[in-house]
Amino acid sequence: MQLTLHTLESISKPSIAVIGLHGWTGDEYAMESVAKLLKLKHVKWFFPRAPYKAPSSKGFTWFEGSDDKGWNYEKTYEGLDRLLEQISNEGFSKENLFVIGFSQGACLAMEYVLRLPFSIAGIIPVAGFIKFKENLKAEHSMKSKSTRVLLM
């Protein structure tokens, strides 16, 4: 699954990669204003669009389903796996990779990154939550333990 992607970079050879994960009903442009406001140098921003259509409004969602029927997020995880591969192929190291997420994107940042078989530079969840607490406890990776987390 290839996620629709928007990118933004400050210079021609950035050394830091940041994945910006939008919230529920957002899209690949929702987090661009954050990047422009921060004006970080040497950064390439990657803004993926969630793969599922939001059921009750415009926009997209990272998780599809309900508590009653169950949740689908396979397309999301598969798409993020491919995005990490792309970022690596562009020459960015895991030590220079950050993930920032807002609301549902913050949830995804925690749920996904803490399952990775390696650590990254950091996670910045903003106004987020952990939806699947028991699953995360059971499935987190000890190899991701060095990933720094800045809760906002």
Which residue stretches match the model-derived regions?
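Gly/Ala-rich beta-loop-alpha elbow adjacent to hydrolase catalytic centers
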Residues: I100-G105, A109
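Serine-hydrolase catalytic machinery in alpha/beta-hydrolase-like enzymes
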Residues: M1-N96
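Active-site signature of alpha/beta-hydrolase-fold catalytic machinery across serine-
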Residues: S33, E111-R115
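The feature captures the conserved acid-bearing segment of alpha/beta-hydrolase catalytic domains
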Residues: E9, I130-M152
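A conserved short beta-strand
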Residues: F118-K131
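Hydrolases whose catalytic domains are alpha/beta-hydrolase-1, hotdog thioesterase
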Residues: L108-Y112, E134
